[in-house]
C-alpha cells in the first residue's frame, strides 16, 4: 500500500534542502557585491478549528543590494477544504475534503532592472489522489534573448530527461498560465508550469519526484548565472521606471490570478508568506 505520509516527509525534506542551497547561493551573490545581507527566517503555524496538527512553515526573506527582495517559503500543511473550494481541487470534493500539501515557493525581485526577476515553486499534494506540481518563469523588465534562451534550455534539459513531450506541454502551459488577461500581455518570457502529475503507485511517485527534483536543480543552476551576468550592468532612470511599471503588472497577476495565492488564502496560510511574492516597490501610470 502506498505510504503518502512517508512520501510527504521525503518531499518536505527535499524542499527544505533545496531552500537551504538556494538561500546560501543568493547570500554568496550578495557577498560578491560587497553586501552583508542575509536571510531572515520566521516560522509560522497554521490554525484550523478542531485540527490538532494543521502544520505550518518557514518564511525566509532577504533584502540586499543585488536581490532587492527575495522570499523563499517552505511549508507543510494539513487540513480540510471548505466545500466550495474543495470542488475546485484535484481529487477533493464534498466526500473527500481533507488535504496535505508540502512545497517550496520562491520569488526574487532584483535591484538592477537588467537582472530578471524570477519565480519558482514545486509542491506535493494529497487529497484522494497524490500529485506533484510546480514550475518556474523568468520575468525581466528589460529582456535579453540570451538570458531567455538559456533559462528555457535549462528547464528543457530537465524535462527531456523525463518525458519527450514534457517541455512542449509544460512550456505551453506556462504561456497560458502566466498571462494577464485584463492587460493582454504575458507576465514575463515564460518557463514551464505543470500540475496534477499523479502518483498512483510508488513507481509513479518516484518518477514524478525525480522530475520535480530536477526542476529545482535546473533553477539553482541557471538563475544565479543570469544574475551574475547582469548585476553589474549600468542602468538609467528610464530603465528603473520601466522596471517599476513592470512590477505593477507582476503584482496584478499575483493578486488576481495566481493559484498559489488563492490556495494559501483559502487554506488559512500565513498571509505574509503568501504575499511575499509582491515587489518591494511598484508604480502604475
Regions inferred by a protein language model and the residue ranges of each:
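Glycine-rich, often proline-containing surface loops adjacent to acidic residues and nearby aromatics
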Residues: 69, 100-102, 131-139, 185-206, ...
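A generic structural motif
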Residues: 7, 110-112, 126-128, 138-144, ...
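Compact, glycine/acidic-enriched structural inserts
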Residues: 128-172
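Long, contiguous binding/interaction regions
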Residues: 261-285
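Internal mixed beta-strand/loop scaffold within catalytic domains of large alpha/beta enzymes
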Residues: 56-134
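Long, charged, mostly alpha-helical binding arms that flank functional sites
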Residues: 158-211, 225-228
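Short helix/loop capping segments that flank catalytic or ligand/cofactor-binding pockets
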Residues: 83-85, 115-117, 144-147, 263-265
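Gly/Pro-rich turn-and-neighbor structural signature
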Residues: 3-90, 200-256
Amino acid at each position: 500500500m502506498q505510504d503518502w505520509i512517508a512520501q510527504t516527509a521525503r518531499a518536505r525534506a527535499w524542499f527544505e534542502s533545496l531552500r537551504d542551497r538556494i538561500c546560501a547561493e543568493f547570500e554568496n551573490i550578495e557577498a560578491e557585491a560587497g553586501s552583508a545581507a542575509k536571510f531572515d527566517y520566521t516560522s509560522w503555524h497554521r490554525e484550523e478549528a478542531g485540527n490538532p496538527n494543521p502544520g505550518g512553515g518557514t518564511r525566509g526573506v532577504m533584502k540586499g543590494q543585488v536581490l532587492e527582495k527575495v522570499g523563499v517559503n517552505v511549508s507543510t500543511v494539513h487540513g480540510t477544504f471548505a466545500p466550495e473550494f474543495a470542488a475546485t481541487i484535484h481529487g477533493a470534493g464534498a466526500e473527500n475534503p481533507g488535504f496535505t500539501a508540502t512545497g517550496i515557493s520562491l520569488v526574487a525581485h532584483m535591484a538592477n532592472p537588467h537582472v530578471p526577476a524570477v519565480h519558482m515553486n514545486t509542491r506535493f499534494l494529497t487529497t484522494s489522489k497524490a500529485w506533484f506540481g510546480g514550475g518556474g518563469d523568468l520575468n525581466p523588465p528589460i529582456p535579453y534573448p540570451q538570458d531567455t534562451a538559456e533559462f528555457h534550455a535549462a528547464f528543457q534539459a530537465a524535462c527531456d530527461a523525463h518525458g519527450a513531450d514534457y517541455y512542449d506541454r509544460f512550456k505551453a502551459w506556462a504561456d497560458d498560465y502566466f498571462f494577464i488577461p485584463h492587460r493582454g500581455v504575458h507576465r514575463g518570457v515564460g518557463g514551464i508550469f505543470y500540475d496534477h502529475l499523479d502518483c498512483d503507485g510508488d513507481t509513479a511517485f518516484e518518477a514524478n519526484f525525480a522530475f520535480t527534483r530536477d526542476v529545482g536543480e535546473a533553477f539553482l543552476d541557471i538563475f544565479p548565472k543570469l544574475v551574475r551576468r547582469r548585476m553589474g550592468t549600468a542602468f538609467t532612470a528610464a530603465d528603473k521606471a520601466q522596471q517599476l511599471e513592470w512590477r505593477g503588472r507582476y503584482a496584478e497577476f499575483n493578486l488576481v490570478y495566481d493559484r498559489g495565492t488563492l490556495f494559501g488564502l483559502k487554506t488559512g496560510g500565513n498571509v505574509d508568506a503568501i504575499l511575499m511574492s509582491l515587489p518591494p516597490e511598484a508604480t502604475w501610470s
